[in-house]
Amino acid sequence: MNARIASVFVLAGALMLPATGQLATPNAAGVSAGHIHLYVSDVAAQQKFWAVMGGVLVANQKLEMIQFPGVFILVRRGETKGGTVGSIVDHFGFAFKDLPAAMAKWKVEGYKIEQDGDSNHGYILGPDGIRLEFFGNPSLKVPVQLDHIHLYPQDVPAMQAWYTKILGGVPAKRAIGGSHEQIDCIDIPGVILAISKSETKLDSSSGRSLDHIGFEVKDLPEFLKRAEAQGATITQKLTPSNFSSKMRVAFITDPWGTKMEVTEGLAP
């Protein structure tokens, strides 16, 4: 990591509260938000982007992660089929306590910002086609926080039912990204899964720059046993992590092509 990126991470870390490294308390199924895993062409450029967003570089033994309150961003170099747009996971969204100050930093760095007349909401395009929704929320207790991950299936009720059954999520309708429009969601501790109907079948997230989303699970072997019995597709069985001796992982995929890593022991 070059000196400039390191200095941005140090500054961001000084603004974060120590407690924000903890993941949310899991739901009754033992599930909470965990991580978002990106495959990118330029790791340094991606690290810089997330540092400017307010992330803090941390490590779980050999596993380097960019920490935000309640979630981690993992970045790995790799070839991809494209960015997030056109994938089942179109984008994810962050809330910012002081949005004008945050946007001023983004403009200095030259990042592309899209807004439709609402000064409190918009999208920023990161390296490798990572689309990030943003909005201001002055009531936040931290400078920045994950708000939602936005999925676009053809069958919204079926997706809600699947995430309720497999991950113990709670169906809801919420205004996402500062909008007044109520859309279908699934509440998971630490993140909202926003679900909007797509008229066409979108690509799987696998192989895209946002390759998969991650959930931290309490008692992962029991979770996988239960999920498989309920019809979930286990694409990689339980295995120890190659990066941390205290962590184990598995992969599942929903019926719409959303690739998910389920972990136990993710946080440093």
Describe each model-derived feature in a short phrase.
Residues N60, F72-F96, P100-H121, E199-S205, ...:
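A cross-kingdom feature marking solvent-exposed beta-strand/loop segments within repeated
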Residues A45-Q47, P100-M103, L220-K225:
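Short, conserved charged micro-motifs
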Residues P26-V31, G82-S87, S139-Q145, S204-R208:
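Short, low-complexity disordered segments enriched in Ser/Pro/Gly and basic
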Residues A28-G30, H37-I73, E114-Y123, L151-L193, ...:
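Core segments of cupin and vicinal oxygen chelate
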Residues Y39, G93-A95, H150-Y152, G214-E216:
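Short hydrophobic/aromatic beta-strand micro-patches
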